[in-house]
Protein backbone atom coordinates (compact mmCIF):
# COMPACT_ATOMS: atom_id res chain seq x y z
CA UNK A 1 0.00 0.00 0.00
CA UNK A 2 1.48 3.35 -1.05
CA UNK A 3 0.40 6.58 0.61
CA UNK A 4 0.79 10.12 -0.72
CA UNK A 5 0.95 13.56 0.88
CA UNK A 6 -2.24 15.32 -0.21
CA UNK A 7 -1.22 18.49 1.58
CA UNK A 8 1.59 18.96 -0.95
CA UNK A 9 -0.91 18.47 -3.78
CA UNK A 10 -3.23 21.12 -2.33
CA UNK A 11 -0.49 23.58 -1.36
CA UNK A 12 0.28 24.54 -4.95
CA UNK A 13 -3.35 25.51 -5.62
CA UNK A 14 -4.47 29.18 -5.84
CA UNK A 15 -5.63 30.76 -2.61
CA UNK A 16 -9.02 32.47 -2.42
CA UNK A 17 -8.76 36.28 -2.76
CA UNK A 18 -11.04 39.12 -1.78
CA UNK A 19 -13.67 40.41 -4.22
CA UNK A 20 -11.41 43.23 -5.44
CA UNK A 21 -8.69 40.80 -6.49
CA UNK A 22 -10.65 38.58 -8.88
CA UNK A 23 -8.40 39.41 -11.84
CA UNK A 24 -5.32 38.43 -9.85
CA UNK A 25 -7.06 35.21 -8.80
CA UNK A 26 -7.74 34.35 -12.45
CA UNK A 27 -4.04 34.82 -13.21
CA UNK A 28 -3.05 32.55 -10.34
CA UNK A 29 -5.54 29.93 -11.49
CA UNK A 30 -4.16 29.98 -15.05
CA UNK A 31 -0.59 29.67 -13.74
CA UNK A 32 -1.64 26.71 -11.58
CA UNK A 33 -3.42 24.93 -14.43
CA UNK A 34 -0.44 25.33 -16.77
CA UNK A 35 2.10 24.20 -14.16
CA UNK A 36 0.09 21.09 -13.32
CA UNK A 37 -0.37 20.34 -17.03
CA UNK A 38 3.42 20.35 -17.47
CA UNK A 39 3.95 18.19 -14.40
CA UNK A 40 1.32 15.70 -15.55
CA UNK A 41 3.10 15.35 -18.90
CA UNK A 42 6.37 14.65 -17.07
CA UNK A 43 4.76 12.03 -14.83
CA UNK A 44 2.98 10.37 -17.77
CA UNK A 45 6.33 10.06 -19.56
CA UNK A 46 7.89 8.37 -16.52
CA UNK A 47 5.01 5.92 -16.22
CA UNK A 48 5.12 5.15 -19.94
CA UNK A 49 8.90 4.60 -20.04
CA UNK A 50 10.15 4.03 -16.46
CA UNK A 51 13.59 2.84 -17.59
CA UNK A 52 14.27 5.98 -19.65
CA UNK A 53 16.57 8.15 -17.49
CA UNK A 54 15.86 11.20 -19.67
CA UNK A 55 12.22 11.25 -18.54
CA UNK A 56 13.30 10.96 -14.90
CA UNK A 57 15.15 14.29 -15.04
CA UNK A 58 13.61 17.77 -14.73
CA UNK A 59 16.11 20.39 -15.88
CA UNK A 60 15.89 24.03 -14.84
CA UNK A 61 17.53 25.12 -18.09
CA UNK A 62 14.22 24.39 -19.80
CA UNK A 63 12.39 27.74 -19.93
CA UNK A 64 8.91 26.25 -19.50
CA UNK A 65 10.09 24.18 -16.53
CA UNK A 66 11.77 27.13 -14.84
CA UNK A 67 9.17 29.84 -15.50
CA UNK A 68 5.93 27.86 -15.42
CA UNK A 69 6.50 24.85 -13.18
CA UNK A 70 9.23 25.64 -10.64
CA UNK A 71 8.02 29.22 -10.14
CA UNK A 72 4.75 27.93 -8.65
CA UNK A 73 4.78 28.26 -4.82
CA UNK A 74 5.04 24.87 -3.15
CA UNK A 75 6.23 23.10 -6.30
CA UNK A 76 9.63 22.10 -4.91
CA UNK A 77 8.01 20.50 -1.88
CA UNK A 78 5.58 18.63 -4.14
CA UNK A 79 8.44 17.31 -6.29
CA UNK A 80 10.17 16.14 -3.13
CA UNK A 81 6.99 14.38 -1.96
CA UNK A 82 6.69 12.58 -5.30
CA UNK A 83 10.27 11.38 -4.83
CA UNK A 84 12.42 13.76 -6.89
CA UNK A 85 15.86 14.58 -5.51
CA UNK A 86 18.05 17.56 -6.25
CA UNK A 87 21.79 17.48 -5.58
CA UNK A 88 23.16 20.73 -4.04
CA UNK A 89 25.33 21.63 -7.03
CA UNK A 90 22.86 20.49 -9.68
CA UNK A 91 20.25 22.42 -11.65
CA UNK A 92 18.16 19.30 -12.19
CA UNK A 93 15.68 17.19 -10.23
CA UNK A 94 15.94 13.44 -10.72
CA UNK A 95 13.56 10.64 -9.76
CA UNK A 96 15.55 7.69 -8.33
CA UNK A 97 14.67 4.26 -9.69
CA UNK A 98 13.75 3.02 -6.20
CA UNK A 99 10.74 5.38 -6.09
CA UNK A 100 7.59 3.28 -6.56
CA UNK A 101 5.77 3.69 -9.88
CA UNK A 102 2.58 3.17 -7.91
CA UNK A 103 3.46 6.28 -5.90
CA UNK A 104 4.04 8.28 -9.08
CA UNK A 105 0.71 7.05 -10.45
CA UNK A 106 -1.14 8.11 -7.29
CA UNK A 107 0.31 11.61 -7.45
CA UNK A 108 -0.57 11.80 -11.14
CA UNK A 109 -4.16 10.77 -10.42
CA UNK A 110 -4.51 13.21 -7.50
CA UNK A 111 -3.10 16.13 -9.52
CA UNK A 112 -5.27 15.29 -12.53
CA UNK A 113 -8.39 15.10 -10.36
CA UNK A 114 -7.69 18.47 -8.71
CA UNK A 115 -6.85 20.15 -12.02
CA UNK A 116 -10.09 18.90 -13.57
CA UNK A 117 -12.03 20.21 -10.57
CA UNK A 118 -10.45 23.66 -11.00
CA UNK A 119 -11.24 23.63 -14.73
CA UNK A 120 -14.88 22.71 -14.09
CA UNK A 121 -15.31 25.12 -11.18
CA UNK A 122 -16.28 22.29 -8.81
CA UNK A 123 -13.26 22.55 -6.52
CA UNK A 124 -13.58 23.27 -2.81
CA UNK A 125 -11.73 26.51 -2.12
CA UNK A 126 -10.51 25.10 1.19
CA UNK A 127 -9.47 21.50 0.57
CA UNK A 128 -8.94 19.25 3.58
CA UNK A 129 -5.51 19.67 5.09
CA UNK A 130 -3.29 16.97 6.45
CA UNK A 131 -1.43 17.53 9.68
CA UNK A 132 2.27 16.98 9.17
CA UNK A 133 5.49 17.22 11.05
CA UNK A 134 8.24 19.56 9.97
CA UNK A 135 8.85 19.79 6.22
CA UNK A 136 11.44 17.33 4.99
CA UNK A 137 14.34 19.16 3.31
CA UNK A 138 15.59 17.93 -0.04
CA UNK A 139 19.22 18.14 1.05
CA UNK A 140 21.10 18.92 4.25
CA UNK A 141 24.65 20.19 4.01
CA UNK A 142 26.97 19.57 6.97
CA UNK A 143 30.07 21.64 7.71
CA UNK A 144 32.31 18.68 6.93
CA UNK A 145 31.79 15.69 4.65
CA UNK A 146 30.78 12.47 6.43
CA UNK A 147 33.97 10.48 5.85
CA UNK A 148 36.06 13.37 7.18
CA UNK A 149 33.84 13.73 10.25
CA UNK A 150 34.55 10.14 11.28
CA UNK A 151 38.23 9.95 10.22
CA UNK A 152 40.62 9.76 13.20
CA UNK A 153 44.06 8.19 13.71
CA UNK A 154 43.90 4.66 15.09
CA UNK A 155 45.19 4.17 18.63
CA UNK A 156 44.60 0.43 19.03
CA UNK A 157 47.42 -1.96 18.24
CA UNK A 158 45.53 -5.21 18.04
CA UNK A 159 44.59 -7.79 15.42
CA UNK A 160 41.33 -8.61 17.23
CA UNK A 161 38.53 -7.67 14.80
CA UNK A 162 36.00 -7.25 17.59
CA UNK A 163 38.17 -4.77 19.49
CA UNK A 164 38.95 -2.92 16.26
CA UNK A 165 35.21 -2.50 15.67
CA UNK A 166 34.89 -0.70 19.03
CA UNK A 167 37.22 2.05 17.85
CA UNK A 168 35.35 2.37 14.55
CA UNK A 169 32.00 2.73 16.36
CA UNK A 170 33.57 5.30 18.68
CA UNK A 171 34.85 7.34 15.74
CA UNK A 172 31.44 7.16 14.04
CA UNK A 173 29.61 9.05 16.81
CA UNK A 174 31.82 12.09 16.23
CA UNK A 175 29.73 12.88 13.15
CA UNK A 176 27.06 14.19 15.56
CA UNK A 177 29.28 17.08 16.68
CA UNK A 178 29.02 19.04 13.42
CA UNK A 179 27.70 22.48 14.46
CA UNK A 180 25.83 23.07 11.20
CA UNK A 181 24.13 19.67 11.45
CA UNK A 182 23.21 20.26 15.10
CA UNK A 183 21.64 23.60 14.22
CA UNK A 184 19.66 21.96 11.41
CA UNK A 185 18.55 19.17 13.74
CA UNK A 186 17.14 21.68 16.22
CA UNK A 187 15.00 23.28 13.52
CA UNK A 188 13.40 19.90 12.73
CA UNK A 189 12.22 19.27 16.30
CA UNK A 190 8.95 20.93 17.48
CA UNK A 191 10.66 21.94 20.73
CA UNK A 192 7.99 24.37 21.93
CA UNK A 193 5.17 21.88 21.42
CA UNK A 194 7.06 19.04 23.11
CA UNK A 195 8.10 21.28 26.01
CA UNK A 196 4.50 22.38 26.50
CA UNK A 197 3.35 18.76 26.60
CA UNK A 198 6.11 17.88 29.08
CA UNK A 199 5.13 20.82 31.29
CA UNK A 200 1.48 19.73 31.25
CA UNK A 201 2.51 16.23 32.35
CA UNK A 202 4.66 17.71 35.12
CA UNK A 203 1.70 19.70 36.46
CA UNK A 204 -0.45 16.55 36.34
CA UNK A 205 2.20 14.58 38.26
CA UNK A 206 2.56 17.38 40.83
CA UNK A 207 -1.20 17.20 41.41
CA UNK A 208 -0.95 13.41 41.88
CA UNK A 209 1.84 13.85 44.42
CA UNK A 210 -0.11 16.54 46.28
CA UNK A 211 -3.19 14.30 46.48
CA UNK A 212 -1.18 11.32 47.69
CA UNK A 213 -2.01 9.28 44.57
CA UNK A 214 1.65 9.16 43.56
CA UNK A 215 4.54 8.31 45.87
CA UNK A 216 7.48 8.61 43.47
CA UNK A 217 9.79 11.61 43.45
CA UNK A 218 8.77 14.46 41.16
CA UNK A 219 10.57 14.14 37.78
CA UNK A 220 12.34 17.06 36.13
CA UNK A 221 10.95 18.63 32.99
CA UNK A 222 14.06 17.65 30.96
CA UNK A 223 13.34 13.97 31.60
CA UNK A 224 9.70 14.46 30.63
CA UNK A 225 10.80 16.30 27.49
CA UNK A 226 12.88 13.23 26.61
CA UNK A 227 9.74 11.09 26.89
CA UNK A 228 7.88 13.41 24.51
CA UNK A 229 10.87 13.51 22.16
CA UNK A 230 11.10 9.74 21.73
CA UNK A 231 7.34 9.42 21.29
CA UNK A 232 7.31 12.16 18.61
CA UNK A 233 10.34 10.62 16.91
CA UNK A 234 8.81 7.14 16.84
CA UNK A 235 5.25 8.07 15.83
CA UNK A 236 5.73 11.13 13.61
CA UNK A 237 9.31 11.73 12.47
CA UNK A 238 10.88 8.39 11.56
CA UNK A 239 9.43 5.49 9.58
CA UNK A 240 10.17 1.78 9.92
CA UNK A 241 11.08 0.01 6.68
CA UNK A 242 11.28 -3.72 6.19
CA UNK A 243 11.80 -3.42 2.45
CA UNK A 244 11.41 -0.60 -0.06
CA UNK A 245 7.98 -1.03 -1.75
CA UNK A 246 8.01 -2.70 -5.16
CA UNK A 247 7.99 -0.09 -7.94
CA UNK A 248 5.27 -2.04 -9.78
CA UNK A 249 2.84 -3.47 -7.20
CA UNK A 250 3.80 -1.51 -4.10
CA UNK A 251 4.32 -4.66 -1.99
CA UNK A 252 6.92 -4.64 0.79
CA UNK A 253 7.31 -8.43 0.66
CA UNK A 254 10.08 -8.30 -1.94
CA UNK A 255 12.94 -10.83 -1.78
CA UNK A 256 16.53 -9.83 -0.99
CA UNK A 257 18.63 -10.52 -4.07
CA UNK A 258 22.03 -9.16 -2.96
CA UNK A 259 23.84 -6.60 -0.84
CA UNK A 260 26.25 -4.19 -2.51
CA UNK A 261 28.08 -0.96 -1.78
CA UNK A 262 27.76 2.41 -3.48
CA UNK A 263 30.64 4.47 -2.18
CA UNK A 264 30.37 4.43 1.64
CA UNK A 265 26.75 3.24 1.62
CA UNK A 266 25.59 -0.35 2.02
CA UNK A 267 22.66 -1.08 -0.31
CA UNK A 268 20.14 -3.92 -0.06
CA UNK A 269 18.81 -4.87 -3.50
CA UNK A 270 15.42 -6.60 -3.46
CA UNK A 271 13.38 -7.99 -6.34
CA UNK A 272 9.62 -8.19 -6.95
CA UNK A 273 7.59 -8.30 -10.18
CA UNK A 274 10.85 -8.64 -12.07
CA UNK A 275 11.98 -5.20 -10.88
CA UNK A 276 14.84 -4.41 -8.51
CA UNK A 277 14.48 -1.91 -5.65
CA UNK A 278 17.28 -0.47 -3.55
CA UNK A 279 17.22 0.18 0.18
CA UNK A 280 20.08 2.48 1.16
CA UNK A 281 21.35 1.80 4.71
CA UNK A 282 22.58 5.30 5.47
CA UNK A 283 24.97 6.00 8.34
CA UNK A 284 25.44 9.69 7.52
CA UNK A 285 23.11 11.79 9.69
CA UNK A 286 22.73 14.41 6.96
CA UNK A 287 21.18 11.71 4.75
CA UNK A 288 19.06 10.15 7.52
CA UNK A 289 17.49 13.52 8.34
CA UNK A 290 16.21 13.56 4.75
CA UNK A 291 15.24 9.90 4.24
CA UNK A 292 13.78 9.50 7.77
CA UNK A 293 13.38 5.77 7.36
CA UNK A 294 15.18 2.60 8.27
CA UNK A 295 15.45 -0.09 10.91
CA UNK A 296 16.77 -0.10 14.48
CA UNK A 297 20.26 1.08 13.45
CA UNK A 298 18.97 4.10 11.57
CA UNK A 299 16.46 4.83 14.36
CA UNK A 300 19.14 4.87 17.06
CA UNK A 301 21.64 6.78 14.94
CA UNK A 302 19.21 9.57 14.07
CA UNK A 303 17.58 9.75 17.51
CA UNK A 304 20.91 9.92 19.35
CA UNK A 305 21.88 12.82 17.10
CA UNK A 306 18.60 14.67 17.79
CA UNK A 307 19.23 14.21 21.52
CA UNK A 308 22.61 15.86 21.01
CA UNK A 309 20.86 18.66 19.07
CA UNK A 310 18.84 19.35 22.24
CA UNK A 311 22.06 19.27 24.28
CA UNK A 312 21.37 15.97 26.01
CA UNK A 313 24.42 13.91 26.93
CA UNK A 314 23.51 10.96 24.72
CA UNK A 315 25.31 7.88 23.48
CA UNK A 316 24.50 5.20 20.93
CA UNK A 317 24.43 1.60 22.16
CA UNK A 318 25.44 -1.38 19.99
CA UNK A 319 24.69 -4.92 21.11
CA UNK A 320 26.30 -8.06 19.78
CA UNK A 321 22.80 -9.54 19.22
CA UNK A 322 22.19 -7.12 16.34
CA UNK A 323 20.13 -4.40 17.97
CA UNK A 324 20.93 -0.72 18.47
CA UNK A 325 19.44 1.88 20.80
CA UNK A 326 20.29 5.02 22.81
CA UNK A 327 21.21 5.98 26.35
CA UNK A 328 20.62 9.49 27.69
CA UNK A 329 22.10 10.83 30.91
CA UNK A 330 19.56 12.24 33.35
CA UNK A 331 21.09 15.06 35.37
CA UNK A 332 18.19 14.90 37.82
CA UNK A 333 18.46 11.14 38.44
CA UNK A 334 22.25 11.05 38.00
CA UNK A 335 22.08 7.92 35.86
CA UNK A 336 21.94 6.78 32.26
CA UNK A 337 18.45 6.08 30.93
CA UNK A 338 17.84 3.29 28.44
CA UNK A 339 15.89 4.66 25.43
CA UNK A 340 14.90 2.43 22.49
CA UNK A 341 13.57 4.80 19.79
CA UNK A 342 12.54 2.05 17.37
CA UNK A 343 10.36 0.47 20.09
CA UNK A 344 9.29 3.74 21.81
CA UNK A 345 10.58 2.36 25.11
CA UNK A 346 12.21 4.15 28.03
CA UNK A 347 13.91 2.71 31.10
CA UNK A 348 13.38 -1.02 30.47
CA UNK A 349 16.94 -2.35 30.01
CA UNK A 350 16.19 -5.94 31.06
CA UNK A 351 13.51 -6.42 28.40
CA UNK A 352 16.01 -7.77 25.85
CA UNK A 353 17.15 -10.62 28.11
CA UNK A 354 13.82 -11.46 29.71
CA UNK A 355 11.20 -10.25 27.23
CA UNK A 356 12.95 -10.81 23.92
CA UNK A 357 14.92 -13.85 25.19
CA UNK A 358 18.12 -12.56 23.60
CA UNK A 359 21.52 -13.96 24.55
CA UNK A 360 23.51 -11.12 26.09
CA UNK A 361 27.31 -11.05 25.84
CA UNK A 362 28.62 -7.66 24.70
CA UNK A 363 26.83 -4.29 24.78
CA UNK A 364 28.90 -1.13 24.30
CA UNK A 365 27.88 2.54 24.52
CA UNK A 366 29.63 5.30 22.57
CA UNK A 367 29.56 9.08 22.98
CA UNK A 368 31.66 12.09 21.98
CA UNK A 369 33.95 11.79 25.02
CA UNK A 370 33.40 8.31 26.41
CA UNK A 371 33.03 4.60 25.75
CA UNK A 372 31.55 2.18 28.25
CA UNK A 373 30.92 -1.54 28.50
CA UNK A 374 27.28 -1.41 29.65
CA UNK A 375 26.55 -5.12 29.22
CA UNK A 376 25.82 -5.45 32.93
CA UNK A 377 22.91 -2.99 32.82
CA UNK A 378 21.08 -5.29 30.40
CA UNK A 379 21.38 -8.55 32.34
CA UNK A 380 20.79 -9.68 35.91
CA UNK A 381 22.96 -12.79 35.69
CA UNK A 382 26.47 -11.39 35.56
CA UNK A 383 28.32 -14.63 36.30
CA UNK A 384 26.61 -16.44 33.45
CA UNK A 385 27.39 -13.60 31.04
CA UNK A 386 31.07 -13.65 31.99
CA UNK A 387 31.29 -17.26 30.79
CA UNK A 388 29.63 -16.34 27.47
CA UNK A 389 32.13 -13.59 26.61
CA UNK A 390 34.68 -15.27 24.34
CA UNK A 391 35.65 -12.54 21.86
CA UNK A 392 38.43 -11.11 24.03
CA UNK A 393 39.86 -11.31 27.52
CA UNK A 394 38.36 -9.07 30.19
CA UNK A 395 41.73 -7.43 30.89
CA UNK A 396 42.16 -6.79 27.17
CA UNK A 397 38.67 -5.25 27.08
CA UNK A 398 39.51 -2.84 29.92
CA UNK A 399 42.76 -1.80 28.23
CA UNK A 400 40.94 -1.19 24.96
CA UNK A 401 38.27 0.94 26.62
CA UNK A 402 40.92 2.98 28.42
CA UNK A 403 42.78 3.63 25.16
CA UNK A 404 39.66 4.70 23.25
CA UNK A 405 38.44 6.76 26.22
CA UNK A 406 41.75 8.65 26.31
CA UNK A 407 41.49 9.25 22.57
CA UNK A 408 38.01 10.73 22.90
CA UNK A 409 39.00 12.95 25.83
CA UNK A 410 42.27 14.34 24.57
CA UNK A 411 40.66 17.72 23.80
CA UNK A 412 38.52 17.87 26.95
CA UNK A 413 39.22 20.45 29.64
CA UNK A 414 40.61 19.34 32.98
CA UNK A 415 37.25 20.02 34.64
CA UNK A 416 35.41 17.96 32.04
CA UNK A 417 37.85 15.07 32.43
CA UNK A 418 37.38 15.13 36.21
CA UNK A 419 33.59 15.17 35.84
CA UNK A 420 33.64 12.27 33.38
CA UNK A 421 35.96 10.19 35.58
CA UNK A 422 33.73 10.66 38.62
CA UNK A 423 30.60 9.88 36.62
CA UNK A 424 32.25 6.74 35.21
CA UNK A 425 33.14 5.58 38.70
CA UNK A 426 29.55 5.96 39.93
CA UNK A 427 28.25 4.22 36.81
CA UNK A 428 30.59 1.24 37.22
CA UNK A 429 29.40 0.83 40.81
CA UNK A 430 25.80 0.88 39.58
CA UNK A 431 26.55 -1.64 36.84
CA UNK A 432 27.68 -4.22 39.40
CA UNK A 433 24.21 -4.35 40.94
CA UNK A 434 21.67 -6.96 39.82
CA UNK A 435 17.91 -6.38 40.08
CA UNK A 436 14.72 -8.24 39.28
CA UNK A 437 13.00 -7.41 35.97
CA UNK A 438 9.70 -5.55 36.01
CA UNK A 439 6.50 -7.06 34.60
CA UNK A 440 6.97 -5.08 31.40
CA UNK A 441 10.58 -6.21 31.01
CA UNK A 442 9.54 -9.83 31.53
CA UNK A 443 7.03 -9.55 28.70
CA UNK A 444 9.14 -7.38 26.42
CA UNK A 445 6.52 -4.67 26.29
CA UNK A 446 6.91 -1.31 24.66
CA UNK A 447 5.03 0.75 27.23
CA UNK A 448 7.83 1.04 29.77
CA UNK A 449 7.53 1.06 33.55
CA UNK A 450 4.47 2.38 35.35
CA UNK A 451 6.44 5.41 36.51
CA UNK A 452 7.29 6.38 32.95
CA UNK A 453 3.75 5.65 31.73
CA UNK A 454 2.48 8.14 34.28
CA UNK A 455 5.04 10.66 33.11
CA UNK A 456 3.82 10.15 29.58
CA UNK A 457 0.27 10.85 30.70
CA UNK A 458 -0.75 7.30 29.86
CA UNK A 459 -2.02 6.23 33.26
CA UNK A 460 -4.53 8.84 34.32
CA UNK A 461 -4.72 11.96 32.21
CA UNK A 462 -7.16 14.83 32.62
CA UNK A 463 -6.75 17.33 29.83
CA UNK A 464 -9.99 19.22 30.65
CA UNK A 465 -10.48 20.05 26.98
CA UNK A 466 -14.05 21.13 26.28
CA UNK A 467 -15.44 21.76 22.81
CA UNK A 468 -17.04 25.23 22.78
CA UNK A 469 -18.36 26.93 19.66
CA UNK A 470 -16.04 29.10 17.58
CA UNK A 471 -17.38 32.18 15.79
CA UNK A 472 -17.67 30.23 12.52
CA UNK A 473 -19.44 27.31 14.19
CA UNK A 474 -21.78 29.70 15.98
CA UNK A 475 -22.64 31.42 12.70
CA UNK A 476 -23.21 28.14 10.84
CA UNK A 477 -24.98 26.53 13.81
CA UNK A 478 -22.95 23.37 13.53
CA UNK A 479 -20.01 21.64 15.20
CA UNK A 480 -18.14 18.90 13.39
CA UNK A 481 -15.08 17.07 14.67
CA UNK A 482 -13.32 13.96 13.43
CA UNK A 483 -10.27 11.94 14.48
CA UNK A 484 -7.80 9.89 12.44
CA UNK A 485 -5.89 7.31 14.46
CA UNK A 486 -3.55 6.80 11.49
CA UNK A 487 -2.25 10.37 11.75
CA UNK A 488 -3.23 10.82 15.42
CA UNK A 489 -5.01 14.08 14.56
CA UNK A 490 -8.36 15.70 15.33
CA UNK A 491 -9.94 18.09 12.81
CA UNK A 492 -12.77 20.56 13.40
CA UNK A 493 -14.51 21.42 10.16
CA UNK A 494 -17.41 23.30 8.63
CA UNK A 495 -19.55 21.52 6.05
CA UNK A 496 -21.65 22.91 3.21
CA UNK A 497 -23.00 20.12 1.05
CA UNK A 498 -19.97 18.06 0.08
CA UNK A 499 -17.54 20.94 0.63
CA UNK A 500 -15.48 20.78 3.82
CA UNK A 501 -13.42 23.59 5.32
CA UNK A 502 -10.95 22.71 8.07
CA UNK A 503 -11.27 25.19 10.94
CA UNK A 504 -8.74 23.79 13.40
CA UNK A 505 -6.70 20.67 14.16
CA UNK A 506 -5.19 19.06 17.26
CA UNK A 507 -2.22 16.71 17.12
CA UNK A 508 -2.35 13.58 19.36
CA UNK A 509 -5.40 11.79 20.74
CA UNK A 510 -4.93 13.38 24.17
CA UNK A 511 -5.08 16.96 22.92
CA UNK A 512 -8.87 17.22 22.51
CA UNK A 513 -10.09 14.67 25.06
CA UNK A 514 -11.74 15.69 28.32
CA UNK A 515 -10.17 12.87 30.32
CA UNK A 516 -8.88 9.33 30.05
CA UNK A 517 -7.69 6.50 32.24
CA UNK A 518 -5.41 3.65 31.20
CA UNK A 519 -5.62 4.54 27.49
CA UNK A 520 -2.77 4.66 24.97
CA UNK A 521 -2.33 4.69 21.21
CA UNK A 522 -0.91 1.46 19.86
CA UNK A 523 0.96 1.37 16.55
CA UNK A 524 1.52 -2.09 15.05
CA UNK A 525 4.49 -1.58 12.78
CA UNK A 526 4.38 -5.11 11.37
CA UNK A 527 0.66 -4.94 10.48
CA UNK A 528 0.76 -1.19 9.75
CA UNK A 529 -2.26 -0.53 11.97
CA UNK A 530 -3.05 1.98 14.72
CA UNK A 531 -5.74 2.09 17.39
CA UNK A 532 -6.51 3.27 20.92
CA UNK A 533 -6.51 0.54 23.57
CA UNK A 534 -6.29 0.20 27.31
CA UNK A 535 -2.92 -0.20 28.96
CA UNK A 536 -1.50 -3.66 29.48
CA UNK A 537 -2.25 -5.21 32.89
CA UNK A 538 -5.31 -3.00 33.42
CA UNK A 539 -8.89 -4.27 33.76
CA UNK A 540 -10.59 -1.14 32.49
CA UNK A 541 -9.81 1.81 30.24
CA UNK A 542 -11.92 4.91 29.76
CA UNK A 543 -11.87 8.01 27.57
CA UNK A 544 -14.29 10.95 27.40
CA UNK A 545 -14.99 13.99 25.20
CA UNK A 546 -17.12 16.94 26.36
CA UNK A 547 -19.16 19.46 24.31
CA UNK A 548 -20.61 22.60 25.93
CA UNK A 549 -22.88 25.17 24.21
CA UNK A 550 -24.30 26.71 27.40
CA UNK A 551 -22.60 30.07 26.82
CA UNK A 552 -24.66 30.52 23.65
CA UNK A 553 -28.42 30.49 23.06
CA UNK A 554 -28.11 27.33 20.98
CA UNK A 555 -29.10 23.76 21.75
CA UNK A 556 -28.57 20.45 20.01
CA UNK A 557 -31.01 19.98 17.13
CA UNK A 558 -29.60 16.64 15.98
CA UNK A 559 -26.33 14.77 15.83
CA UNK A 560 -24.69 11.96 13.89
CA UNK A 561 -21.81 9.98 15.38
CA UNK A 562 -19.44 7.54 13.67
CA UNK A 563 -17.54 5.71 16.43
CA UNK A 564 -15.76 2.56 15.22
CA UNK A 565 -14.81 -0.14 17.73
CA UNK A 566 -13.28 -3.59 17.47
CA UNK A 567 -13.54 -6.37 20.06
CA UNK A 568 -12.12 -9.90 20.23
CA UNK A 569 -13.16 -12.80 22.43
CA UNK A 570 -14.61 -11.56 25.72
CA UNK A 571 -13.61 -7.95 25.14
CA UNK A 572 -16.36 -5.38 25.72
CA UNK A 573 -16.70 -1.73 24.76
CA UNK A 574 -19.57 0.47 25.90
CA UNK A 575 -20.14 3.90 24.34
CA UNK A 576 -22.58 6.36 25.91
CA UNK A 577 -23.72 9.81 24.79
CA UNK A 578 -25.42 11.72 27.61
CA UNK A 579 -26.60 15.30 28.11
CA UNK A 580 -24.58 17.29 30.63
CA UNK A 581 -27.34 19.74 31.62
CA UNK A 582 -29.65 17.17 33.17
CA UNK A 583 -31.81 16.77 30.06
CA UNK A 584 -33.26 13.33 29.38
CA UNK A 585 -32.09 13.46 25.77
CA UNK A 586 -29.12 14.95 23.93
CA UNK A 587 -31.57 16.64 21.54
CA UNK A 588 -32.38 20.12 22.91
CA UNK A 589 -29.55 19.86 25.47
CA UNK A 590 -26.96 22.62 25.91
CA UNK A 591 -24.13 20.11 26.08
CA UNK A 592 -23.25 16.43 26.14
CA UNK A 593 -20.48 13.97 26.86
CA UNK A 594 -19.24 10.92 24.95
CA UNK A 595 -17.71 8.19 27.13
CA UNK A 596 -16.13 4.92 25.96
CA UNK A 597 -15.27 2.15 28.45
CA UNK A 598 -13.04 -0.80 27.53
CA UNK A 599 -13.19 -3.98 29.63
CA UNK A 600 -12.88 -7.75 29.33
CA UNK A 601 -10.60 -9.95 27.31
CA UNK A 602 -8.48 -12.91 28.41
CA UNK A 603 -4.83 -13.67 28.99
CA UNK A 604 -1.73 -11.52 28.67
CA UNK A 605 -3.17 -9.74 25.63
CA UNK A 606 -6.57 -8.97 27.17
CA UNK A 607 -5.83 -5.27 26.68
CA UNK A 608 -5.66 -5.89 22.93
CA UNK A 609 -9.17 -7.39 22.81
CA UNK A 610 -10.80 -3.94 22.98
CA UNK A 611 -9.80 -1.37 20.37
CA UNK A 612 -11.06 2.06 19.37
CA UNK A 613 -10.64 3.55 15.90
CA UNK A 614 -8.50 0.71 14.48
CA UNK A 615 -7.31 1.57 10.98
CA UNK A 616 -4.44 1.17 8.56
CA UNK A 617 -1.59 3.65 8.90
CA UNK A 618 -2.18 4.44 5.23
CA UNK A 619 -5.90 5.12 5.68
CA UNK A 620 -7.40 8.56 5.09
CA UNK A 621 -10.70 7.66 6.76
CA UNK A 622 -11.97 9.03 10.08
CA UNK A 623 -13.21 6.26 12.43
CA UNK A 624 -14.43 8.96 14.84
CA UNK A 625 -16.66 11.57 13.17
CA UNK A 626 -19.20 13.69 15.02
CA UNK A 627 -21.59 16.11 13.25
CA UNK A 628 -23.83 18.28 15.43
CA UNK A 629 -26.61 20.57 14.16
CA UNK A 630 -27.73 23.36 16.51
CA UNK A 631 -30.80 25.58 16.79
UniProtKB/Swiss-Prot annotation:
SUPFAM superfamilies in the cross-refs: Cysteine proteinases, Galactose-binding domain-like, PUG domain-like
Cell compartment(s), UniProt: Cytoplasm
EC number(s) on file: 3.5.1.52
Cofactor(s), names only, from the UniProt record: Zn(2+)
Signal peptide: none
Cofactor note: Binds 1 zinc ion per subunit.
Modified residues (Phosphoserine): 126
A single Gene Ontology CC term: cytoplasm
Domain PUB: 34-97
Catalytic activity: Hydrolysis of an N(4)-(acetyl-beta-D-glucosaminyl)asparagine residue in which the glucosamine residue may be further glycosylated, to yield a (substituted) N-acetyl-beta-D-glucosaminylamine and a peptide containing an aspartate residue
Top-level EC class: hydrolase
Name of this chain's protein: Peptide-N(4)-(N-acetyl-beta-glucosaminyl)asparagine amidase
Gene: Pngl
